[in-house]
Amino acid sequence: VIGGGSRRRNVYHLTEEGRILFDSLGEDTLKPRKSSSTGTAYGDVPQIGEVFGRSTLIQSALSLIKEHHSFILSGLPGIGKTTVGVALSNDLIAAGTTLRWSTADEFSDFEALCSRMDLPQTLPSDFEALSEYIAKQCQDEIFIFDDVHLLSQRHLSRFHAFCKQIEQLQGPKFIFIGREPLVSFEHVERLSIPPLEISQAVKLLGEFQRKEEREHIAERLGGHPLAIQLYQKEATLPEANSDIQSYVEDVVLSTLDDSTRTELDHLVLLPQPIEASKAHDDEIVGTLDDSAFLRWTSGMEKMELQHLIRYVRRSSMTK
């Protein structure tokens, strides 16, 4: 030790009793131990911060993956689908599950998605060979496919064929993540992600405002996580914030044609939930519900628009 002065050293000698005890422990105790209860994640799993208000939802997802070979996490854009997926992944890994994550885009086919999962060998190009390889090599794993709503129509049929074949071969289980509507996944068990409860949504706003003010903002933005994170104190009403207005108009409502937007605005003006049959155009209710734009009462008798959409559209209509 340089400049550390003299250092006293103690030497300890094993007794005969200690030697016997040491020998009885065996050689394995000399090797570093790796916890057998921890799984591994492969692929480009997104990084997330602290997750609020999703514990019950994650428990429901854990139950679904035990009961079904596949299911889908779905909901509005920005509602926290990927966040829930990553939080679920962390729980699965902690329980000893190996999983592989792949994020889709408009050009992805099944082979491209698998190539992003760090599989140990070059993938076979033949349909049957690839299915059998994945089913055998990854039998006890879970594959997570994010943004499946981006898959193009020309790749969807082959994607579903692979998934079906691997299920028949008792291969890895699948978790799909995507925004509604997801017509091609109608056959898959669904877990819809709702807005956050206001008591949890306020946690996204930090502690810089009074509790009552934070609750007001979270309520006006419908407990929508991304909208709350986009909020900046520049407008009298949270829903009039320019970033939030642009997000709802350009992203959330981007899948609706002009006629559907017109019918949506009839619901915007309603002061309270109504029965679906009493809507201005009851046929449009199904379209909006497929896109996760509606909130239903507990008995599913009445519906209204998601609060984020309702308040933002009302604000833009009064300009």
Where are these regions (language model features)?
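Walker A/P-loop nucleotide-binding motif
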Residues: 68-85
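Conserved catalytic segments around the Walker B and adjacent sensor/switch elements
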Residues: 90-108
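Conserved NTP-binding/hydrolysis module of P-loop NTPases
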Residues: 108-128, 135
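N-terminal pre-P-loop "Q-motif" helix
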Residues: 47-65
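C-terminal leucine-rich, beta-strand-based interaction scaffolds used for sensing/assembly
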Residues: 275-319
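Amphipathic alpha-helical "lid/sensor" segments that cap RecA-like P-loop NTPase cores
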Residues: 198, 206-250, 261, 299
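Conserved P-loop NTPase "ATPase switch" module shared by AAA+ and STAND
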Residues: 133-158
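Winged-helix-like regulatory helical subdomains adjacent to P-loop NTPase cores
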Residues: 237-282, 286-287
